[in-house]
């Protein structure tokens, strides 16, 4: 078999979205940040898999509203745009 098809030298995939334990009180905010980061880099499916939540999940509405306020205060227009997009999805459901 060609070495091109052998993955024996591959290591574990690097952790793209480091998150605290799910029972950690900071998990929802960290998950919201991970989902927004994933959307920013074009890896929404990876962020959703890492968090177990989806982009626009109403369970994270409060956290994303907090991130939106922070981004507006900091002048981070890209993060503001992503947070607003997330909240629009919350408002209309997962569709």
Task: Label the model's feature ranges.
Residues 79-80:
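Solenoid-repeat scaffolds in large eukaryotic assemblies
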Residues 1-63, 74, 85-95:
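Long, non-catalytic architectural segments outside compact domain cores
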């Amino acid at each position: 078999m060609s070495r091109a098809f052998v993955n024996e030298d591959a290591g574990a995939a690097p952790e793209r979205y480091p998150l605290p334990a799910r029972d950690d009180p900071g998990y929802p905010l960290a998950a919201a940040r991970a989902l927004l980061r994933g959307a920013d880099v074009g890896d929404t499916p990876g962020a959703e898999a890492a968090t177990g939540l989806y982009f626009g999940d109403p369970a994270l509405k409060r956290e994303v509203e907090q991130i939106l306020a922070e981004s507006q205060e900091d002048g981070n227009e890209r993060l503001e745009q992503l947070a607003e997009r997330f909240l629009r999805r919350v408002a209309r459901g997962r569709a």
